[in-house]
Amino acid sequence: MARETDCDLDKKTSLTSDAEMRPEPPALCVNPGNPVFSCMLDPKTLHTATSLSKAQMIMYKTSASQYGAFSPRPFFFPCKFLPQEQAFTEHLKTTGFYQNNSLNVGPDRTRTIDSPNYQHTL
């Protein structure tokens, strides 16, 4: 059998003392903020259900179809309608959009082509 020396005992005690001195690693989310969107809650427990509804994920309470389920109520309507002047639109209606009918024969200049490192590579 191998005989333990003082050096071996010192190594063993230092290893155990280091393990005892180390604090436990903190949880990943120490400050959860919103517990629904943090990692403090187990995703399997995020379901909610009442006697009138089926179980549903808390993170996704509404679907796209639920946003348009109710028609707008009168208290959401604006009180006054103030149309803006349509001068720009009227000008476009009479003159049309700008058309550039010139012929583009010049080389395209980009930063890559104009860079001194790439000037003689083409």
From Swiss-Prot:
Q: What happens when the gene is disrupted?
A: Mutants born at the expected frequency. At 8 dpc, they have a reduced beat frequency of nodal cilia. The motility of tracheal cilia in adult mice is also affected. 25% of tracheal cilia axonemes have missing dynein arms. Double Pierce1 and Pierce2 mutants show high levels of embryonic and pre-weaning lethality. The few mice that survive birth display hydrocephalus and laterality abnormalities, dying by 20 days of age.
Database matches in InterPro entries = PIRC1/2 (IPR026507)
Query: Where does it mainly reside?
Result: cytoplasm
Where does it sit, as one GO cellular component term? Answer: axonemal A tubule inner sheath
Q: Where in the cell is it found?
A: Cytoplasm, Cytoskeleton, Cilium axoneme; Cytoplasm, Cytoskeleton, Flagellum axoneme
Pfam families referenced in this protein's UniProt entry, alphabetically: PIRC1_2
Tell me the superkingdom of the source: Eukaryota
Function statement: Microtubule inner protein involved in the attachment of outer dynein arms (ODAs) to dynein-decorated doublet microtubules (DMTs) in cilia axoneme, which is required for motile cilia beating.
Q: What is this protein called?
A: Piercer of microtubule wall 2 protein
Give the organism, scientific name. Mus musculus
Q: What is the lineage of its organism?
A: Eukaryota, Metazoa, Chordata, Craniata, Vertebrata
Name of the encoding gene: Pierce2
